[in-house]
Amino acid sequence: MDPLVGIIMGSDSDLHVMQAASDILKQFGIPHEVTVVSAHRTPHRMIEYATTAKDRGLKVIIAGAGGAAHLPGMVASVTVLPVIGVPIKSSNSIDGWDSVLSILQMPNGVPVGTVALNAAKNAGILAAEILGTADEIISQKIADYKTSLNTEVLEKVEQMKKDGWENKFD
């Protein structure tokens, strides 16, 4: 099946973070592609990737970048697809703040949906939710996933009670 989500990153050094987006999309059974597209080192590749994405069948692009983190915004500027930005705390970043602010502070007309620092898993979930608006099977998988999160927390609450931690809520 052709990919529905593109996962791109500025460098292969970002793969350890962006892997989480791929993992959650696999869990939901959503076909996707993963590659390196640098806004600074391969600008022509970036433009070609973004401008051909829709015609290639992609519905959402997840773009991760560290440092100056121009990739998500530049991709968003040349595609009509939703772009989800993942700020990455890199070796040359200012504790990740430069990446966060570069992706968050986009001008009017060029939105980038932004997740937390290194939160590629949430980017994958958000991409799945976007796809789920038009696909009931994906929507149900997301609902099941969220139910499992609820169950997991309630099991931990019960374990805490068994371990002697009391509260007046339960």
Language-model segments: residues:
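Short, solvent-exposed amphipathic alpha-helical segments in soluble enzyme
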Residues: A21-K26, T51, V78-V80, E129-L131
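C-terminal binding/interaction regions
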Residues: P3, M9-H16, A20, G96-D170
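Helix-adjacent hinge/juxtasegments
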Residues: T52-D98
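Glycine-rich phosphate/diphosphate-binding loop of Rossmann-like nucleotide-binding domains
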Residues: D2-R41
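Amphipathic alpha-helical hairpins
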Residues: V5, P31-D55, G64-G67
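Short beta->alpha connector loops at strand-helix junctions that form conserved
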Residues: M9, V36, A65, V86-K89, ...
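Short glycine/serine/threonine-rich phosphate/pyrophosphate-binding segments
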Residues: D14-M18, T42-M46, A65-M74, S93-W97, ...
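Proline-centered loop/turn at the N-terminus of a beta-strand
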Residues: L4, P82-P87, V110-P111
